[in-house]
């Protein structure tokens, strides 16, 4: 027996599918984590082809409260110590499995130098991953964020993931996290 759908049913199915494809999961807004107001004004041209994954090399956080504090600490360091207009990353990932909005999808980051900042989204895992791996929940959060970015047109469908060390002289994103992202389907070496 074949199924026949009315035009209204097709519209409903399309809307349901569109919603599922664009679900961005849990992104903690700047307001929710207590961010200072951004002074950044440069827009990021979209869709973006590259994503640079780094680690903060600082303290690990594994609860929403500790990750909110850590996001504030990173922003404080970038703004007050380095003199930047905001936290350098577009997004931060906590070991609580949540994504924390940094500069977001639309604002030029300060994460990978003058060559890569204008053409890449910067995602940084909060913690030091030289000798340990992030928990599965944090890795899933990053993958969901990337899928969301592609579904919503912030990233090109053929976007490429790079490790921070692929584009700059650094140990970031740490040896263990770097091994993991090299297995991701969109990872490409420079």
UniProtKB/Swiss-Prot annotation:
Which Gene Ontology molecular function entries are recorded, alphabetically? N-acetylmuramoyl-L-alanine amidase activity; peptidoglycan binding; peptidoglycan immune receptor activity; zinc ion binding
Give the principal location in a single coarse category.
Answer: secreted
Which keywords describe this protein according to UniProt? Antibiotic, Antimicrobial, Disulfide bond, Fungicide, Immunity, Innate immunity, Pyrrolidone carboxylic acid, Secreted, Signal
Query: Where would I find the N-acetylmuramoyl-L-alanine amidase domain in this sequence?
Result: 46-174
Note the superkingdom of the native organism: Eukaryota
Q: Which CDD domains match?
A: PGRP (cd06583)
KW Disulfide bond (keyword) present: yes
Asked if the keyword Secreted belongs to this entry, the reply reads yes
Cellular component GO terms held in the UniProt record: extracellular region
InterPro entries for the chain: Amidase/PGRP_sf, Amidase_domain, Peptidoglycan_recognition, PGRP, PGRP_domain_met/bac
List all disulphide bridges recorded for this chain: 24-148, 40-85, 61-67
User: Which residues are modified to Pyrrolidone carboxylic acid?
Assistant: 22
The cross-references to Pfam families, in alphabetical order and at most eight, read: Amidase_2
* A biological-process GO annotation: killing of cells of another organism
The subcellular localization recorded is: Secreted; Cytoplasmic granule
Q: Which residues form the signal peptide?
A: 1-21
Task: Report the function annotation for this chain.
Answer: Innate immunity protein that plays several important functions in antimicrobial and antitumor defense systems. Acts as a pattern receptor that binds to murein peptidoglycans (PGN) of Gram-positive bacteria and thus provides bactericidal activity. Forms an equimolar complex with heat shock protein HSPA1A and induces programmed cell death through apoptosis and necroptosis in tumor cell lines by activating the TNFR1 receptor on the target cell membrane. In addition, acts in complex with the Ca(2+)-binding protein S100A4 as a chemoattractant able to induce lymphocyte movement.
| Family named by the database record | Belongs to the N-acetylmuramoyl-L-alanine amidase 2 family.
| Subunit-structure text | Homodimer; disulfide-linked.
Instruction: Output this protein's name.
Output: Peptidoglycan recognition protein 1
Q: What is the lineage of its organism?
A: Eukaryota, Metazoa, Chordata, Craniata, Vertebrata
């Amino acid at each position: 027996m074949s199924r026949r759908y009315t035009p209204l049913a097709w519209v409903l199915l399309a809307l349901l599918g569109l919603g599922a494809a664009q679900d961005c999961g849990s992104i903690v807004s700047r307001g929710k984590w207590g961010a200072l107001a951004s002074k950044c004004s440069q827009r990021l041209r979209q869709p973006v082809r590259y994503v640079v994954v780094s680690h903060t090399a600082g303290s690990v956080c594994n609860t929403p409260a500790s990750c909110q504090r850590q996001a504030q600490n990173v922003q404080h360091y970038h703004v007050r110590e380095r003199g930047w207009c905001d936290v350098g990353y577009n997004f931060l990932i906590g070991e609580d499995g949540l994504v924390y909005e940094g500069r977001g999808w639309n604002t030029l980051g300060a994460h990978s130098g003058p060559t890569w900042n204008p053409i890449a989204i910067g995602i940084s895992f909060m913690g030091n991953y030289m000798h340990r791996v992030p928990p599965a929940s944090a890795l899933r959060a990053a993958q969901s964020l990337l899928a969301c970015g592609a579904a919503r047109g912030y990233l090109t469908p053929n976007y490429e993931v790079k490790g921070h060390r692929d584009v700059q002289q650094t140990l970031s994103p740490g040896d263990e996290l770097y091994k993991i992202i090299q297995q991701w389907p969109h990872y490409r070496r420079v």
